[in-house]
């Protein structure tokens, strides 16, 4: 991973630790996690929440915070949010298998 990628990953980790609820899990997946990224690759983020989803305002705040973090850096952050139960129900999907195969835990 380049110094720039390490810097961006560090900023994502810090933001996640600051804004996500206790017991949330933040993972990096896709080409950035597999160390196959090009300079234009986006940052794919999976956020898992314990229990029920929070209010729509909280949900929007988390999504917007991660997306807007990338703007001054010239990178695209793509967060997706599920509860742990919703995520477990996706175990048979190719998306689940792809994420779990090459993910990097950022916040837990």
Write out the residue ranges for each language-model feature:
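Catalytic core of pol beta-like nucleotidyltransferases
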Residues: 1-27, 33-39, 49-108
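Short, conserved active-site loops that position catalytic residues or coordinate cofactors/metal ions
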Residues: 41-43
């Amino acid at each position: 991973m380049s110094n720039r990628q390490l810097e961006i990953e560090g900023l994502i980790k810090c933001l996640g630790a600051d804004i996500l609820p206790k017991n949330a899990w933040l993972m990096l997946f896709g080409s950035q996690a597999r160390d196959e990224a090009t300079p234009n690759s986006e940052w794919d983020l999976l956020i898992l929440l314990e229990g029920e989803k929070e209010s729509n305002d909280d949900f929007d705040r988390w999504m917007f915070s991660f997306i807007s973090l990338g703007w001054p850096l010239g990178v695209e952050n793509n967060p997706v949010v599920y509860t742990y139960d919703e995520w477990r129900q996706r175990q048979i999907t190719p998306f689940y298998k792809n994420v779990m195969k090459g993910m990097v835990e950022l916040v837990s």
